[in-house]
Regions:
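Membrane-interfacial catalytic/cofactor-binding modules of polytopic membrane enzymes
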Residues: 152-220
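Terminal transmembrane helix and immediately flanking juxtamembrane interfaces
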Residues: 1-157, 177-182, 212-244, 250, ...
Length: 366
């Protein structure tokens, strides 16, 4: 099917169209707290939401930059998927085989693609439209921080999706033209560690609980309890779908949860400082001497570990496959183009027992 504005543009349009209906549903018990579209520009000015918008625009450009450098760096850092295969084996394959169903595949694929983008966008928007600037701050900071923390793992610890490594595992997420084109254009397909579908949702839930504890109330009495349940329900679906669709390893959940713990604690602590900057000035956001020294020390330590232990390290062992499939399997992978002036060079080395046939397809000619 020919999508006039492409799969990504179509998804963004659906995201915008769903914002108000879902917000109205979740706030049906307190319509008086809603911000109308006519009043939204004034609400943005009065509550100082300009930096939220700027932050999301910055993250859009930053992600494009990271994805652009992901593939070229793999020549020096390789991949570590074989470590996870040695630990987990074919557990996710058994999950897929036990539940595989065409209707379930369609539902979970649509949910996986759309709902993650929707939660990224909707979380701060929900609180803005509900007149809760503190939680709007926390939701925006949550996405910013958890993605920033994940980037080093995405760039230096490449782990392929399970459908690219477990023989017999079907890439159910990429089963139709829409989702295939969406992920080829927007997903390097080797950013399994950590799972931000899990991490982002879990950190939002943790932030909610830190917030109500500070307020001295029960989560069940919180005015945003239905939104909390909405996030919780989506997290439950993700825990199953990331395995069923042939995307994440079970172990990917652990780093996602670890990122969530760090992100939630930091965001909860720093949000009052960020909110008070309007009275205290931008200088109040700068770290003190102790915090600066600690940050530099951690950055140097992590950078040294990456340069010594990862670059040209265990991940570039040519005898370890970074892509596997069984005899008779047909597997789709994407070759990313990063320059209009330089060709893409791809080397295929068969380290298995059976012959391999490779066919290159230009999507523009299909």
């Amino acid at each position: 099917m020919n999508w006039p504005i492409g799969p990504y543009g179509t998804s963004m349009g659906a995201l915008l169209l769903m914002t108000l209906p879902i917000h109205w549903f979740l706030t049906r018990d307190e319509p008086e707290s809603r911000v109308g579209l006519r009043d939204l520009p004034r609400e943005i000015r009065e509550k100082g939401y300009g930096w939220h918008i700027a932050l999301y625009l910055l993250m859009f450009l930053y992600k494009a930059l990271i994805d652009h450098h992901n593939e070229p760096m793999k020549a020096r850092v390789g991949g570590f998927t074989h470590w996870f295969w040695s630990i987990e084996g074919d557990w996710t394959l058994r999950v897929q085989e036990a539940f595989e169903n065409d209707l379930l595949t369609d539902i979970l694929s649509g949910h996986y693609l759309f709902m993650y983008l929707f939660i990224i966008w909707f979380s701060p928007m929900y609180y803005m439209l509900s007149r809760d600037e503190r939680m709007a701050d926390k939701a925006a900071l949550n996405y910013f921080l958890i993605y920033i923390l994940s980037v080093p793992l995405y760039l230096f610890f490449n782990v392929e999706v399970t459908s690219s490594y477990i023989p017999g595992m079907d890439a159910l997420l990429y089963h139709d033209d829409f989702t295939l084109r969406f992920f080829i254009d927007n997903d390097p397909m080797d950013n399994s560690i950590p799972s931000l579908h899990i991490g982002l949702s879990a950190s939002l839930l943790m932030i909610n609980r830190l917030h109500v504890r500070e307020l001295g109330i029960s989560i069940s009495d919180w005015r945003h309890r239905e939104f909390d349940l909405f996030i919780m329900a989506n997290l439950g679906v993700y825990l199953f779908s990331i395995q069923y669709l042939g995307i994440h390893w079970v172990f990917d959940v652990i780093p996602g949860l670890m990122m969530a713990v760090v992100t939630a604690g930091f965001v909860h602590a720093v949000q009052p400082v960020v909110r008070a900057r309007r009275e205290n000035g931008l200088a109040s956001l700068l770290p003190d001497r102790r915090q600066t020294i600690a940050a530099i020390g951690v950055a140097l330590l992590c950078s040294s570990w990456l340069m010594i232990g990862v670059v040209d390290g265990a991940g570039v062992d040519e005898d370890q496959p970074n892509f596997r499939f069984g005899e008779g399997d047909v597997v789709i992978d994407a070759i990313e183009v990063h320059s209009l002036n330089h060709p893409v060079t791809m080397t295929v080395k068969n380290v298995g027992e059976h012959s391999v046939e490779v066919m290159l397809v230009d999507l523009r000619s299909v």
